[in-house]
């Protein structure tokens, strides 16, 4: 749908823009810039993502964020406001969309990197707290009536506060509501976090690509480096095969893939041998349930929330490494989440 964006950058937008004082640039990339700003009326910090807007289309990211904002999910970054601006950075006639979001101090990428630099990994309790909330975020996105696939889950797109243990999924620039009979672009998602069906170019994928990406983050937090670290697309597939073994003919058929670039003798590596140090058996079990070649064989986000790996989060004495209590909202599910649960999931997750 066409949109007259020059008109959109009108008086209302200028009034909205005046509500914030930009303090510094917090991030920059091919998508645009993220600015740290302060709301003049409340004094609270916000993040403003500024992206150039194609005048031919409405911004899908904004539409998705507006929809998600109505759900008020604690693990999805909240859209606070938006406005358009014209010009800037030597491009006088370009129109920019400015998306105002709640501020969260760090990305999971930077938080984990601070541990890796000290030759250690995040404490297991922190992995549990962050993973539980990340799974909740995609469980919400994947509810059938919503059916949004994020398509670019990686540590850079996960916001965290290590002191409070809170986590919020962000950056919905690649997100899309999937329809079963509609093809989608397969060259999506950052390579290290890309599911096998995407590597094979399958255009009729499902939201199960997100659970694969979440699994990659899970393993990375425990390994100190990406679990599948290919230099290119074919190299990425080889790294997956090294750990999962060669897919069967049936699995390849379901992936719409071929075996031409796969080592015919590759056998699965036991999860105990994948990680550098001994870990609880529940870690290996959860990895085995996430990392399946066939998308509909992967554990669902709601089932993953019921996995024994997270049992420690249910204990009232459990605390964060900071000494603070666990986030209060961990088991406070929204009506939409409860509606999407099976009876067994409700029985387990709501009885805490």
From Swiss-Prot:
Enzyme Commission code(s) on record: 2.7.11.26
InterPro entries, sorted: GSK-3, Kinase-like_dom_sf, Prot_kinase_dom, Ser/Thr_kinase_AS, STKc_GSK3
Catalytic reaction(s) noted: L-seryl-[tau protein] + ATP = O-phospho-L-seryl-[tau protein] + ADP + H(+); L-threonyl-[tau protein] + ATP = O-phospho-L-threonyl-[tau protein] + ADP + H(+)
Coiled-coil region(s): none
Cellular component, GO annotation: axoneme; ciliary basal body; ciliary plasm; ciliary tip; cilium; cytoplasm; kinetoplast; nuclear lumen
Positions annotated as active site in the UniProt record: 152
Domain (Protein kinase) ranges: 20-310
GO biological process annotation, one example: protein phosphorylation
Ligand binding (ATP): 26-34, 49
UniProt keyword annotations, A-Z: ATP-binding, Kinase, Nucleotide-binding, Serine/threonine-protein kinase, Transferase
GO MF: ATP binding; protein serine/threonine kinase activity; tau-protein kinase activity
Disulfide bonds: none
Matching CDD domains: STKc_GSK3 (cd14137)
Top-level enzyme category: transferase
Quaternary structure note: Inhibited by cyclin kinase 2 (CDK2) inhibitors, including GW8510.
Family listed: Belongs to the protein kinase superfamily. CMGC Ser/Thr protein kinase family. GSK-3 subfamily.
Misc. comment: Was identified as a drug target for the treatment of African sleeping sickness. RNA interference leads to growth arrest and altered parasite morphology, demonstrating requirement for cell survival.
Protein name as annotated: Glycogen synthase kinase 3
Top-level taxonomy: Eukaryota, Discoba, Euglenozoa, Kinetoplastea, Metakinetoplastina
């Amino acid at each position: 749908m066409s949109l007259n964006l020059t008109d959109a950058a009108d008086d209302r937008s200028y009034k909205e823009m005046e509500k914030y004082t930009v303090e510094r640039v917090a991030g920059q990339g091919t998508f645009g810039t993220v600015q740290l700003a302060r709301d003049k009326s409340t004094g609270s910090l916000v993040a403003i993502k500024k992206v150039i807007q194609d005048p031919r289309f409405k911004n899908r990211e904004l539409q998705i964020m507006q929809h998600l904002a109505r759900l008020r999910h604690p693990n999805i970054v909240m859209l606070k406001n938006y406005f358009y601006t014209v010009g800037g950075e030597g491009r006088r006639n370009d129109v920019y969309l400015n998306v105002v979001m709640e501020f969260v101090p760090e990305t999971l990428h930077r938080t984990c990197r601070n541990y890796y630099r000290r030759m250690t990994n995040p404490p297991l309790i922190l992995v549990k707290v962050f993973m539980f909330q990340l799974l909740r975020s995609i469980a919400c996105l994947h509810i059938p009536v919503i059916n949004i696939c994020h398509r670019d889950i990686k540590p850079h797109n996960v916001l965290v506060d290590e002191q409070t243990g809170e986590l919020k999924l962000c950056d919905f620039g690649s997100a899309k509501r999937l329809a079963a009979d509609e093809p989608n672009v397969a060259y999506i998602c950052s390579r290290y976090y890309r599911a096998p069906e995407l590597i094979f170019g399958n255009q009729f994928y499902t939201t199960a690509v997100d659970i694969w990406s979440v699994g990659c983050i899970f393993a990375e937090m425990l390994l100190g480096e990406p679990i599948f670290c290919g230099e290119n697309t074919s190299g990425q597939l080889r790294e997956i095969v090294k750990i999962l073994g060669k897919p069967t003919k049936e699995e390849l058929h379901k992936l719409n893939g071929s075996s031409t670039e796969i080592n015919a003798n590759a056998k699965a590596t036991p999860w105990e041998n994948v990680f550098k140090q001994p870990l609880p058996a529940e870690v290996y079990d959860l990895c085995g349930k996430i990392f399946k070649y066939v998308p509909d064989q992967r554990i669902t986000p709601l089932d993953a929330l019921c996995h024994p790996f997270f049992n420690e989060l249910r204990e009232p004495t459990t605390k964060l490494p900071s000494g603070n209590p666990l986030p209060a909202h961990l088991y406070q599910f929204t009506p939409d989440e409860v509606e999407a649960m099976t009876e067994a999931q409700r029985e387990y997750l709501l009885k805490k």
